[in-house]
């Protein structure tokens, strides 16, 4: 179709994405990952009510259920989603599950009762959500599981290339610590697809290095929990050489534990998501690297997807993907290139200044005035 559709066609060949939706309503929050609007699509089945085009007499209403609304990634996602809501004239209701799966179920059920046009959710437990996603489908409401694959016909997962990216991070870390020693992994929670894939990728990368031991702790995506986990791991493992956290907000907290322990420069810190503070930490040398997913871009893109679903457009691809970029200083980029890690020949590696520019330009990149023109 138009520019956004063409862009997504290219992006779906690249990596992974998550999801989000726009403006208005009670609490601001965020979500997971996203590229440009979905690829060429087909009309929704007649049995599914299709919402009105954005800006029409009946404004499209999207309901979004986030894991929480305090993590900086989610905060930025909300901002991006609200910008899309402004651009396309839709309404978005943001709700937080506060890290509680039962809350997440209840919030989705409330959106079904309200009769919103599309529901987006960042699943705490993808498999556990299937019954309520099926309930939404039966009510004629399309859904987007951001970073979660739920096998329901009218559900569209949005994901990043998390497993492969984190495998590369693990191998880079292994090379930097001399292929021996002890590293720590701070993950989110079991059952969350993003957390599970990033955890799986890290172990896949470390499998090649039998002289490296990985210790781990869950964080539930919560920075204070992440700081405590890092403190405990550093205390229990004085020979720790590296820490990888699967979300920047948690990594920034964990870095404070490294600093307090007097281990700056001794413990390599790597991260994921690419929020502004993390990009500054890469520039200053506090972090060795992060991965730019672009939370604001993710939020904006997911709104576009939700608007198309609500208006009866179905993406050609069942699982939607968003591009990502490794972020490191030019000096570390040169070292990374010399490591010869398998699968990195075509990986995008940019410096923090380039990442900030990309992150700020998401609206110009994605906005399509003909998004719903058919």
Region spans (language model):
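Hydrophobic core
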Residues: 9, 13-17
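Sec-dependent signal peptide recognition
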Residues: 2-10
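Hydrophobic membrane-targeting alpha-helices
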Residues: 4, 16-21
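A residue-level marker of the well-folded mature domains of exported/periplasmic proteins
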Residues: 13, 21-374
